[in-house]
Amino acid sequence: MKIGLLVDGRTEYHALPHVIPRLGSPHQILLPLVCDIQPFASPAQMALAASKKFPILLSKGVDSIVILIDKETRQDCTGELVQAVEREARERLAVHSTTATLAVVFKVSKFENWLVADPPGLRVLAAMFENVERIEKQVAPNRADGVDALGLLKACSRKGGYHKVKGALAICEQLDPVRAAANSRSLRKLLKVLECPGAAPPVSPQCRGRSAPIGR
């Protein structure tokens, strides 16, 4: 199966190709395309932004499309938000294809949370980071999705500070996806969607309290 990735940021666009070969998916995963999805947009607006890239991916012969979106600080239940965006996006995909499938994965809360989820990989980058144990104490076990990941990367960077794209490129060259997934539930979801070996099924979403209805 050929899978097309749609991402919502330049950092993911540049960095993910460095880790995709190590995901171990049995499928062919194409290099990502960027689409202008705003994290606080409605599900319908997110689907519209993603759908503008559907013809490009379908022309490349993809059988499935995976859309990666930052959740940021949205209070919506992640599972309900995924379902809402998938419903809207699948309606738009059906206009172009009756066979292609589609899945949505939210990065909780953003791409940097996946980058901090593999402290041993960060230790390899000794010229870039110090005090990696500070990161490890916060992300392990299974807590990477809940930390201020960008703040941690900046705080533990050596002289020169942390550059989002260059830093992500370096980290993704060292990142062990399965090791990182042990600390990130949202990354485990991506590995599951891509059918990567070692990807444990994520726990069913637990929605704490009643969130407001997710608008179209």
Give the location of each predicted region.
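C-terminal accessory helical subdomains adjacent to catalytic cores in phosphodiester-
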Residues: 2-3, 13-38, 44-64, 70-216
